[in-house]
Amino acid sequence: YLIAGVTVTENGEVTQYSRDQIKIYTQGRFMYAFNNAVIESIDVGAGDASWSNGVMVEVPRVNHHGPVSGYSFDVAIDQTETGFEQTVIGMEYEGGRLLDMVEVWDKASTATSAFDGLWQLQTRESNEPNISEFAETKMIGGGHYIWLQNAVFEGEPVKEFGFGTFEVDANGDAIETAMTSSIPDYEGTVSAVKMELLDKNHFTQSFVYNGETVTQTYMRM
């Protein structure tokens, strides 16, 4: 799903926002990502999703700061002709800010693949001496993908995200076309990725970055 608009209420003040945001639900998991003007930072979350008494219960397991636990959000969802409307009451942000949000979402695709799901990076083979402590969460579903990366680059912590469209054939040859990212130069790029399912809970992907082949192994979350 791609967001069509969002209304935020804070301390009685109502603000309308338009932003590039994606949300993927698949196989009992969720992930969303966008550049958040409210907190002036990236805003990414992923975790478990399940229906309970007519509401979607989202339990985050990771966000842009890293692994998280102890949170649960009841998300009221109303189906629409083009997607759904989502209401979250009492969303807490850094500094104790409490926001109420109403989001309107449009369905982007119903495509499926064998790689659909929420994945956590296990190993990374790369000749990048300036990068360490590299962690990644990746979601694939509905013909789209999202990735969240946390790492240390040249001694400084960095956190980035990207999302776009995803196509893969029966041989595992995938094309990822970037739509939005916290890295401006990444937007609009088209990446060829070789993917292989090792079993139902693990896959590898390889791609060329700065002339070097990067190979990564993921485990299903």
Where are these regions (language model features)?
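Lipid interaction determinants
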Residues: 1-46, 52-163, 169-221
